[in-house]
Structure formats: structure tokens, C-alpha cells
Amino acid sequence: MDTAQKQRWAITLSYDGSRFYGWQKQAGGVPTVQAALETALARIAGESVATTVAGRTDTGVHAAAQVVHFDITAARPQQAWVRGVNAHLPEGIAVLHARQVAPGFHARFDAYGRHYRYLLESAPVRSPLLKNRAGWTHLKLDIEPMRRAAALLIGEQDFSSFRAAGCQAKSPVKTIYRTDLTQSAGLIRLDLHGNAFLHHMVRNIMGALVYVGSGRLSVEGFAALIQERSRLKAPPTFMPDGLYLTGVDYPGAYGIVRPQIPEWL
């Protein structure tokens, strides 16, 4: 059917990444977020639906506010794309908001900012209640040098030292607008706001910050690591469990509002 007859919708969804093998559809019926979402959307639309996501997430990585767009010919009310779709989604995924958008809107290319949070438990024994919800280290961490190191990430830089080997990004140069590191009740929260992120970038940053907090890497060493622009001397990639995509920024004209981070997170 002529694409001119189609409507473009944008939805914001949340999901528990520990239940899925990442965002992207895979062969062999492997459970992924995209496969589950497109199946549920098709049930409501009465036609096959292809989705485009703001940012793909790996196995075990969560989303508090992921954004997706899709095109459909079927006319459905807004609540059909929220309550209706949720009725057909498996546990671990929920559509939070839906909005019809301009035909030219693109969930990935129109995004000018992305927000991530890494939740880290620092304790001698890992809490079973936080498994799959937070990363963990048995090491006692000093948060002050970690804060100073994280602040060095701000600005436009070449982040090759925090880039996965298989990263498909055209350039390792990204801009970090803000970093924030807090600690309460044994949990450390790292918040990063940037224009875009490389594959495994946040997890690699957290791995290096854990080295800083434990004294295995100085703040000066962290600065040198950034300048090395190489993974060869960098600490290992940290576990995915504590990583959350918490928001995506779009121009106000699209009307897509970034929800607040849940209080429990």
C-alpha cells in the first residue's frame, strides 16, 4: 500500500533486559524486545509492523524510556497502542506512551541526546534481590576519585578507549554533556548524558571507574586512558546488569516528552 496513506507513531517503552537477548530480532525464535513488540503491534494493527529504535540495547541491558517509531495503515486510537499493545506483550515489556508524529520523524536520527544510568552495588556479598537489576563489585570503592574521573569525560572527545571491538559507529568522537555520580545505601549511581554512545561505552566507562574507586587506577591514569584511544590498556567491560537507558531527547516540536526516572531506580 502507498506509504502516503500510512500514519507514523512513536511509542515510549520500558523493559527488563534480563528477560531478552537484546533489542534486535534474531533468527531461530530467540526472545528479543523487538520481536515481542512487533508481534504485539501486529495484533493491534492487523498487519505486519516494522519498528525503528532510538538505540539498540544488548542482552541484559534495561530501558526505562526507550523510543520507537513505526508506520501503520490501520486507524487506531492512541490507547490501542498503549493498553491494547500491553495486553499482548510478554512480562518484562510495557508501552508507557504513544503519540502520532510527523511522517518525517525518526526515532534514531532525530534524537539529539541520550541518558544512561548505571546502578552499581558495592558490597562484600552480592544481594540476590539486586541480581539482574544492578552491577556488583565486592571491592570497597572511594567515590570521590570516581567523581573526578567521570568529570573528565565531559566534552567532545574520541572515546575509542571505551569502544567495543565490534562497534559499528562511523566515528568514535562523541559529546558527553553531563556526568553525575552519587552513592546512597550501598548503591552507586552513574548518570551520563551525551549526544550518542558507542557500543559498550557506558559499561567500559564503569569498568574503568571501578578501577579508579578501588585504587587500581589513578584519576591521572584515567585521563591518560582517554588519551590512549585504545582498548588495549583499558579495564574489562563491566557487566550489563546495572545499565539502563533512561531517556532520549528530541526537538520539542515532536511532542515526545522524556519521562522522569522511576524513584526506585
UniProtKB/Swiss-Prot annotation:
<keyword id="KW-0819">tRNA processing</keyword>
<dbReference type="GO" id="GO:0160147">
    <property type="term" value="F:tRNA pseudouridine(38-40) synthase activity"/>
</dbReference>
<comment type="function">
    <text>Formation of pseudouridine at positions 38, 39 and 40 in the anticodon stem and loop of transfer RNAs.</text>
</comment>
<dbReference type="Pfam" id="PF01416">
    <property type="entry name" value="PseudoU_synth_1"/>
</dbReference>
<comment type="similarity">
    <text>Belongs to the tRNA pseudouridine synthase TruA family.</text>
</comment>
<feature type="active site" description="Nucleophile">
    <location>
        <position position="58"/>
    </location>
</feature>
<dbReference type="InterPro" id="IPR020094">
    <property type="entry name" value="TruA/RsuA/RluB/E/F_N"/>
</dbReference>
<dbReference type="InterPro" id="IPR020097">
    <property type="entry name" value="PsdUridine_synth_TruA_a/b_dom"/>
</dbReference>
<dbReference type="GO" id="GO:0003723">
    <property type="term" value="F:RNA binding"/>
</dbReference>
<dbReference type="InterPro" id="IPR020095">
    <property type="entry name" value="PsdUridine_synth_TruA_C"/>
</dbReference>
<keyword id="KW-0413">Isomerase</keyword>
<dbReference type="InterPro" id="IPR020103">
    <property type="entry name" value="PsdUridine_synth_cat_dom_sf"/>
</dbReference>
<dbReference type="GO" id="GO:0031119">
    <property type="term" value="P:tRNA pseudouridine synthesis"/>
</dbReference>
<dbReference type="InterPro" id="IPR001406">
    <property type="entry name" value="PsdUridine_synth_TruA"/>
</dbReference>
<protein>
    <recommendedName>
        <fullName>tRNA pseudouridine synthase A</fullName>
        <ecNumber>5.4.99.12</ecNumber>
    </recommendedName>
</protein>
<comment type="subunit">
    <text>Homodimer.</text>
</comment>
<feature type="binding site">
    <location>
        <position position="116"/>
    </location>
    <ligand>
        <name>substrate</name>
    </ligand>
</feature>
